[in-house]
């Protein structure tokens, strides 16, 4: 006699509760059905993987992880996956040799890496500049009047680099109409995520990406996203990957907090993340492709900013703001001029400049010196603060969204330019796949 459906469903709930109890803290109540257990902090990503493995074994559903894909880490998602029509049967012995999960025909891309999807995530709190000034003991109006900061985005509760990265990634996957199982490589950058496993490994675990999907965490601080793009493009051009996820995520406000650093420095920063799906696809009228990239390091400015741990929970900070501001404007201007030469795209024909934005005043100065409208610089630092490696990413998200809404023939190139402590620098061009315009 078959088991009634309601009893079967009850048994599944009992299995889920049993597996959750193994991973939750002893005094933790049973979570709500829709609660994302990783984002709420009830479980870390490795514990969630443990829950999935336990349920797979107890319910005899060996492909549960694949079914969940990018679903939330919730009881409701587990039940939906378990009760789906494609209920797995016990594994049967394989008589044929399976090919590796990543096996497939060689990738022929002519060096092309196309952006299929993009996403962003910001700290959920919007903190006005006057509140930040008060917290740091700054003179009223200092951040707004001298730096141009109107507000900063700040994480709260369980939010962290990992959560922000996951939210941005889900948005990018959705836009790209892709699944975690499609990814061949994850490239992640963060200047604030410390410890092990690395942020890339945690994100791989959260996405339930396949075990043949590589992970690489890259550095460069505020230049990290461009470093990630360069690596992704190389992997795709070499035929080593078809789809690559590039993610940036930084939470500054917990480390650069009042009492740890001066407000003139710490008050400039916010929290955010960005994500991009790059693919070895043939360019279509709706897509953008990675073009020319340049990198370097102005080592003469290596001592202009130094950040490290100090006693008593404080941060050891050396920050020559005046020298860095002069160097930043000059270097960003040179990067853009060099990109013009290499790409044969005039700055007047650029749709947006997704640059690093240490502060809004510096962006305004750069726009004046370049003689381009300030409107071509997406608004990030003014309302979010300096997002570190995600500043360029959030700016590029905005630029791509605006350009994607235009007819294909009206879309314009996007210039990237960023700086990192050291003084690391880099730039790149994102080309639309619409018919090329003759250079001026």
Annotate each language-model stretch with its function:
Residues 2-103:
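Phosphopantetheine-dependent thiolation modules in NRPS/PKS and related acyl-activating systems
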Residues 100-158, 260-326, 330, 334, ...:
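Condensing-enzyme catalytic core mediating Claisen C-C bond formation in acyl metabolism
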Residues 115, 157-222, 342-363:
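Conserved beta-ketoacyl condensing-enzyme motif
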Residues 116-119, 189, 219, 244-250, ...:
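Short beta-strand segments
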Residues 136-144, 195-209, 246-255, 307-310, ...:
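Acidic-glycine-rich active-site phosphate/pyrophosphate-binding loop
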Residues 149-150, 182-185, 205-219, 255-261, ...:
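Glycine/charged-rich beta-loop-alpha catalytic/anionic-binding loops adjacent to active sites
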Residues 162, 166, 192-193, 210-212, ...:
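Claisen-condensing/thiolase-fold acyl-transfer catalytic domains that form or cleave C-C bonds
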Residues 237-270:
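Flexible, glycine-rich active-site loops centered on histidine and acidic residues
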């Amino acid at each position: 006699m078959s088991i009634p459906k309601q009893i079967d469903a009850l048994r599944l709930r009992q299995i889920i509760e049993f597996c959750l109890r193994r991973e939750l803290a002893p005094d933790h109540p049973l979570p709500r059905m829709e609660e994302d257990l990783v984002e709420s902090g009830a479980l870390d990503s490795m514990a969630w993987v443990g829950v999935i493995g336990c349920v797979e074994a107890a319910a005899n559903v060996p492909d549960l992880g694949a079914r969940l894909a990018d679903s939330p880490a919730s009881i409701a998602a587990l039940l939906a996956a378990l009760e789906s029509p494609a209920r797995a049967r016990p594994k049967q012995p394989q008589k044929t040799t399976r090919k590796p999960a990543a096996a497939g025909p060689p990738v022929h891309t002519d060096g092309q890496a196309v952006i299929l999807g993009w996403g962003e995530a910001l700290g959920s709190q919007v903190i006005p500049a006057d509140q930040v000034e008060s917290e740091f003991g700054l003179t009223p109006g200092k951040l707004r009047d001298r730096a141009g900061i109107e507000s900063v985005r700040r994480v709260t509760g369980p939010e962290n680099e990992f959560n922000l990265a996951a939210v941005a990634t889900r948005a990018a996957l959705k836009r790209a109409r892709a699944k975690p199982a499609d990814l061949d490589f994850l490239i992640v950058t963060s200047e604030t995520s410390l410890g092990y496993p690395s942020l890339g490994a945690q994100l791989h675990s959260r996405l339930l990406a396949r075990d043949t999907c590589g992970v690489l965490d890259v550095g460069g601080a505020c230049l990290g996203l461009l470093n990630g793009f360069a690596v992704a493009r190389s992997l795709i051009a070499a035929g080593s990957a078809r789809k690559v996820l590039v993610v940036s995520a930084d939470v500054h406000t917990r480390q650069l907090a009042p009492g740890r650093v001066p407000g003139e420095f710490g008050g400039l920063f916010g929290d955010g993340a960005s994500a991009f799906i790059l693919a070895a696809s043939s360019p279509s009228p709706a897509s953008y492709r990675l073009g020319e990239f340049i990198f370097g390091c102005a080592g003469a400015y290596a001592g202009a900013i130094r950040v490290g741990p100090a006693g008593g929970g404080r941060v050891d900070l050396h920050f020559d703001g005046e020298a860095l501001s002069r160097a930043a404007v000059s270097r960003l201007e040179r990067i853009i001029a060099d990109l013009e030469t290499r790409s044969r795209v005039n700055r007047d024909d650029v749709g947006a400049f997704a640059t690093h934005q240490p502060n809004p005043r510096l962006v305004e100065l750069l726009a004046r010196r370049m003689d381009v409208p300030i409107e071509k610089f997406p608004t990030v630092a003014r309302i979010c603060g300096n997002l570190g490696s995600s500043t360029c990413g959030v700016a590029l998200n905005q630029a791509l969204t605006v350009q994607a809404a235009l007819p294909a023939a009206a879309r314009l190139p996007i210039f990237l330019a960023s700086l990192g402590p050291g003084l690391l620098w880099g730039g790149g061009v994102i080309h639309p796949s619409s018919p090329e315009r003759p250079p001026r």
